[in-house]
Amino acid sequence: MKKFLTKALFLFFCAFSVVSYGAEHTVKMLNSGQGGSMVFEPAVLKVNVGDTVKFEASEPGHNSASIPGLLPSDAKAWQGGLNQDVTVKFDKEGVYVYQCTPHLVLAMIGVVVVGDATNLQEIKENSKQITSKFVMNKDRLDSYLATLN
C-alpha cells in the first residue's frame, strides 16, 4: 500500500508540474534592430497557451502595452511602465497586438500569436484604428499580420 501511494503521489506531482509551467520567451524593446528603427524583436512571436513573454526594456524610453480592440475578447490587458521590463502570461488563444506607447506614431508595435490565430480577421479590421496614427512605417503592422495567413 505504501509503495502504491508513493507511486501515485510521484505521478501526480509529475503531471502537475507539466501542466503548470509554460515556456518563457523574451521580446526586446529596441531603438534599432533588424526590422528598422523603433522595433520589438522578435516582431512577431508565436507561443502556446500558458506561455509567458518577458518584454525586456533593452534600451531606454520604451514600454510594452496591449492595445484595446487588438487582442482576443476576454484576454487580460497589460500596461508596462516606461523603462521597465514587464512579464505577461498568455492564457487566451488568438492574436495580440501591442505597442510602445511613446513611439506608437513611429509604428513601434509587435504581435504575439497564442496558439491559433482565431481572431485574425477581427484584428485586421480593428487595426485600421491604429495604423491611421502612424507617421512612418505605415505598413509595418499590415506586413506583420500578413505573415499569419
Segment roles from a protein language model:
Residues 1-9:
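Bacterial N-terminal signal peptides that target proteins for export
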Residues 8-17:
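Bacterial N-terminal signal peptides
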